[in-house]
Swiss-Prot record:
Disulfide-bond pairs as recorded: none
Pfam family, one: DNA_mis_repair
Entry's Gene Ontology cellular component terms: mismatch repair complex
Organism of derivation: Klebsiella pneumoniae subsp. pneumoniae (strain ATCC 700721 / MGH 78578)
Protein name as it appears in the record: DNA mismatch repair protein MutL
Xref: PROSITE patterns: DNA_MISMATCH_REPAIR_1
């Protein structure tokens, strides 16, 4: 077959495979377009879980008649125009793929009017060439998008849609996340003609807390500690639940936003988890709603098809900043009794971070503050007026754009001089608190496969290769239930000897617990499913080696087989970076807490700084 340019319809459907996963994906893309257009009210109408109808109506700036056809074309956008714009994304959308992708798998109608136009216009694409038809319509200033019969022309995709209740649940969660990101926008959600959610725009702090309680529940609001933490161009705001009152239901509330974009980032989650580790059990998770604002030049949002992940240029800096901000709030909550509302405010300096004091550039005294109220403990790195925004604290809101000349250069964070220590320090600050459920903080990567950690007042080297091996063993070892098996698209069929066949038959119960589904016949073995850690492996090599190992064993212990597989899996990482190391340690700390308490040989090696310093003095 010769190389040829794909037809527009086929190209758009391929792109839709990444952008349009389910009805909730459509809602997310279209609502983000409304927010980028400056809308202050968004109405979302859903029918049959989004399979029948998704209608998004806003009062934004609208689209000009001459641009309606372009709006439905691939890679057509008003968000960016040059490479410089791509390196500093401030809008939620920027690729120009959403409308074209959605229109290729559904019947999409776009109706819009700008303030300059006297009448509205409606556009829709149809036919194999996606030809756009534009005609007059009646509509106020703003835009309405109707998506009918999602996946009507791709039956395979439609077959994988879940029940109406499940799909609407995903839509409800997306709308909830967006409502938490933009307090200044009214969002109404209806399903099958019934109003399900009404999030009204709020401005004052008390109203924000009411909206927070509406979305996250009264239990979260009751134990929420407000954060406002700032250093240079980095700002962290939001709420974290008191770890001492965290319940499994509260732990489901983990919402994180980077420059107003909802995000799932393991680096941020690890920083928060590490800050709460002394107060959380091994099986507990923190609950939080946090907003991180950062120079757009220092974060890459163009790394995930659905823009769910970002990559920080200074990941260690961001990690330590978030860790310090959350930890300081939790320490204040423990060190200072809550004041009654009628009591006069008494200034009190914030204690230094006991774990990072002297070793973290963010650990320096804050300005005097008032005692916390019931809901908020808000240490601020700088006076509110220094942010240049009226009204002190700033919350998610519509911004006209990021100005490069505003704020100090991001790299000044690395050159921030150390603040002088206070004359009086709490006695407990002299001792460095240990990490009860953490290996410590990653300082740097050494040799490509080792992490240098700050741990229990000293330094240690951790082998990332060994840590990954232990993580795989934990993932492969069954607990109360067997490891979940992942079916292979094409089963693997191998020829075996009579001895290997007998060994496989004897080991079959153990293999089933490990998520390996094998079937034998006269001369062959067929592998139909493997556990998730094996999916990316070369099974043509690994499975014969596993069969050879089993043929040499007299007994088949599940733990021994899991250990053998963990040692023989091929690592995807040949050289680690900071973000990968932090994510790996977060998984190991969560799945293998026993390694933190009693590290096995080859995993952790203390670094003797005293001997090195004495050697330098002797010289």
């Amino acid at each position: 077959m010769p190389i040829q340019v794909l037809p527009p319809q086929l190209a758009n459907q391929i792109a839709a495979g990444e952008v349009v996963e389910r009805p909730a994906s459509v809602v997310k893309e279209l609502v983000e377009n409304s927010l980028d257009a400056g809308a202050t009210r968004i109405d979302i109408d859903i029918e049959r879980g989004g399979a029948k109808l998704i209608r998004i109506r806003d009062n934004g700036s609208g689209i000009k008649k001459d641009e309606l056809a372009l709006a439905l074309a691939r890679h057509a956008t008003s968000k960016i125009a040059s490479l410089d714009d791509l390196e500093a994304i401030i809008s939620l959308g920027f690729r120009g793929e959403a409308l074209a992708s959605i229109s290729s798998v559904a019947r999409l109608t776009l109706t819009s009017r700008t303030a300059e136009q006297q009448e509205a216009w409606q556009a829709y694409a149809e036919g194999r060439d996606q030809a756009v038809t534009v005609k007059p319509a009646a509509h106020p200033v703003g835009t309405t998008l109707e998506v009918l019969d999602l996946f009507y022309n791709t039956p395979a995709r439609r077959k994988f849609m879940r029940t109406e209740k499940t799909e609407f649940g995903h839509i409800d969660e997306v709308v909830r996340r967006i409502a938490l990101a933009r307090f200044d926008v009214t969002i109404n959600l209806s399903h099958n003609g019934k109003v399900m959610r009404q999030y009204r725009a709020v401005a004052q702090d008390g109203q924000r807390e009411r909206r927070l309680g509406t979305i996250c529940g009264a239990a979260f609001l009751e134990h929420a500690l407000a954060i406002e933490w700032q250093h240079g161009d980095l700002t962290l705001r939001g709420w974290v639940a008191d770890p001492l009152h965290t319940t499994p239901a509260l732990a489901e509330i983990q919402y994180c936003y980077v420059n107003g974009r909802m995000m799932r980032d393991r680096l941020i989650n690890h920083a928060i988890r590490q800050a709460c580790e002394d107060k959380l059990g091994a099986d507990q998770q923190p609950a939080f709603v946090l907003y991180l604002e950062i120079d757009p030049h220092q974060v890459d949002v163009n790394v995930h098809p659905a823009k769910h992940e970002v990559r920080f240029h200074q990941s260690r800096l961001v990690h330590d900043f978030i860790y310090q901000g959350v930890l300081s709030v939790l320490q204040q909550q423990l060190d200072a009794p809550l004041a009654e509302k009628d009591d006069p405010p008494a200034p009190r300096p914030m204690p230094e971070n006991r774990i990072a004091a002297g070793g973290n550039q963010f650990a320096r005294p804050a300005e005097a503050r008032e005692p916390a109220t019931r809901f908020s403990i808000t240490p601020s790195r700088e006076p509110a007026a220094s942010s240049g925004k009226p009204g002190g604290a700033s919350w998610p809101h519509a911004q006209p754009g990021y100005q490069k000349q505003q704020g100090a250069l991001y790299r000044q964070l690395l050159d921030t001089p150390t603040s002088p220590k206070p004359a009086l320090q709490p006695p407990a600050a002299a001792e460095l608190a240990g990490h009860s459920q953490s290996f410590g903080r990653v300082l740097t990567i050494v040799g490509g496969d080792c992490a240098l950690l700050e741990r229990e007042g000293g330094l240690a080297l951790l082998s990332l290769t060994v840590a990954e091996r232990w993580l795989r063993q934990a993932q492969l070892t069954p607990g109360a239930e067997a490891v979940c098996a992942q079916p292979l698209l094409i089963p693997l069929r191998l020829k075996v000897t009579e001895g290997e066949k007998q060994a496989l038959a004897a080991a079959q119960p153990a293999l089933a617990q490990l998520g390996i589904d094998v079937h034998t016949d006269a001369l062959h073995v067929t592998v139909r499913a493997v556990p998730l850690p094996l999916r990316q492996q070369n099974l043509q090599i690994l499975i014969p080696e596993l069969i050879g190992y089993l043929a040499q064993q007299n007994a088949f212990d599940v733990g021994n087989i899991a250990q053998w597989m963990a040692r023989n899996l091929t690592s995807e990482q040949t050289s680690w970076n900071m973000a990968q190391a932090i994510a790996l340690l977060a998984d190991v700390e969560r799945l293998c807490p026993q390694l933190v308490r009693t590290p096995p040989g080859g995993l952790l090696q203390p670094v003797d700084l005293h001997s090195a310093m004495n050697a330098l003095k002797d010289e």
